[in-house]
Amino acid sequence: MKGRRLWMTVGALAVLGAAALVLLRGKGLRMRTVHRLRALLHHDEAIEEGTAGAFSNVIFLHHSVGRYLIEQGGVRERLSEAGYRFWDHDYNYIGITDPSGALTGYSYGVPDDNTNPDGLAALFAQPLHELPLNAFSGLMQHEVILFKSCFPVSNIRSDEQLEQYKQWYLAMREVMDDHPDHLFIVLTPPPLNPSATTPEAAARARAFADWLLSDEYLEGHPNVATFDLFGALAEDDPDSPEVNMLRADYRRDGEDSHPNETANREVGPRLADFIIRTAEAYREEVANGE
């Protein structure tokens, strides 16, 4: 298997190297090509360690909210202490951070850097290759895959938009069903600052989060789980005018919808513990042939 993978890597590198030369003669070497080459060169490190049913090789696809959650919430450190190898994928230009906390210098090339529901659905619709030739194949080098959209997604302006979100996540779930050797953890999108939303849009954001947590979405799909980031960050007092919006004690100054350090310090350990519990439970389920 290793020999076959080596020759596949060499072949893929040759093709991408030729493409790079063409780009150099024309528009210049694009960062996407550089990242793809680096991902191919490093893929063995990701695919060989923490695999074979251990479900301890974890990657988290996110943007800035996830970055602060990881850094300020001690997510990587907590998972490392429990024996997990935690990678995370930020914007493409930042790329992937490895389990030691070091930037790798490459990304998996998320199409258009789009982690909104439509972008995630497009990512999951990519063909799966043994090598990380696209973003989906890159994420699938890891056994536990977390992903989230950022807070603008919580500005759900109509019931029709809410239903479209659900359809995209159902399409993703169909793909997840095809890969029981992987565990997928969905994070509900974080809530918005009250200045950036309306009560109606916020209520739909809560409804979307609740749906992702529901039996309707999860029952019968044992390798799919949901962490309620929205619920962890949103005001839940039904009598508050800011219900379903970013909690006052979790806000930064002004109108910024990024949760503050207090929020990240409180929620980060909860996320790490959820990953550990969920991975352990699924590992046992797979081992028992359930």
Residue ranges and their predicted role:
Residues 1-16:
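N-terminal Sec-pathway targeting helices
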Residues 17-37:
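Membrane-interface motif at the C-terminal end of an N-terminal transmembrane signal
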Residues 122-131, 160-172, 201-214:
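Well-ordered, non-membrane alpha-helical segments in soluble/globular domains
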